[in-house]
Amino acid sequence: MSKNIESLLLNQRYWDIFAVARNSSIDEACRIMDKNRIGALLVYCSDTNDPQDLEGIVTERDVIELISRKGKEALNNEVKEIMSKNIISVTPQCTKLEALDLMMENQIRHLAVMDKEKLVGVLSMRDLIKQL
């Protein structure tokens, strides 16, 4: 079994990349995550409307923290208000262990997978653990 992320991408059942525009409502982001049973969405620039023009990431954890602080009314706010702007990424050539170490070091559960400047996937901690 290969140890790099590329092999994981090739063996995935599907590799749709789920993203939302930064001016979308948090409620809309929650619906996309729920419908697709995912824990994070990449956030792209609303001006270009290009999912490759990444600006951040929003996770279930971001939503929970928002609701605990401001209540469910805050779900009408825009995604850009809670997204993390620092997108941490790996390349397809990165090993699974390096990716897991990066997640643990940064206390995150999702990594963007970038091949040069192109987004090719999103890797979750669950994806990695399934491979152990």
Tell me what each language-model feature is:
Residues M1-L132:
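Tandem CBS (Cystathionine beta-synthase) repeat/Bateman regulatory domains
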